[in-house]
Amino acid sequence: LPVSAREAYENPFYLEAIRGVSQLCNKRQYINTVITGESEEEILQVIKTMARSGQVDGFIVLYSRQDDPIAGFLYNEGFLYVLVGKAYAHANQTIYIDNDNLLASQEATEYLYQMGHRRIGYIGTDTSMIFSADRKSGYQTALLQHNILPRADYCVEIAASEKDSAPLRCLLSIPDRPTAVVVSDDILAVTLERVCLEMGLSIP
């Protein structure tokens, strides 16, 4: 799991992924262990200890991040691993499973455009997370296809562990605020909904 166990366990994506992995491992009579921590250094140390114990056959990394030291270690040491998300480095030598995040965001933005919206914002996690970078790119591509220049003040990026809703309030407080927003994941969407309600803004 990515850094910060609390946020990871609050995210339904990770919970569903863990459930699926556990079910399959149980059927095959494999033992699986969930690894997470408060820092990359902590996670990496646990992985090094487990990998070098000789008791681990492989790893499933439930995220993909730019310049990730954990994926880098597994690759450099020749351990078997699978990434959930697009590989940032060594893509041709890495087994990874991904959906088309760029297309998904592009279609979401296009839907809002067809609904009549022209001031469309974007809220995502920081773009070191590959899925978030792709979703932001898809959003920007859809706007440019309609000759709409993406506005920097319409794009908010919040670290996965960030709890401060101030950037969202700032976005919703500008005079010509967006009339619609593309959000990169469910957790941020729930946060945005809460902020809108607190500010007295209606959501269709």
How does the language model describe each region?
Residues L1-V46:
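Amphipathic helical "hinge" segments at domain boundaries
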Residues S4, S39, Q66, Y88, ...:
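Short, glycine/serine-rich, charged loops/turns that create anion-binding
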Residues A5-Y9, T33-G37, A51, V56-G58, ...:
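Short, contiguous strand/loop micro-motifs
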Residues G20-Y30, F73-L83, A87-P204:
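Bacterial carbohydrate/catabolite-sensing allosteric modules
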Residues E42-I47, P69-I70, K163-P167:
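Short acidic active-site motifs
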Residues Q45-G58, K136-Q140:
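Short, electropositive alpha-helical surface patch
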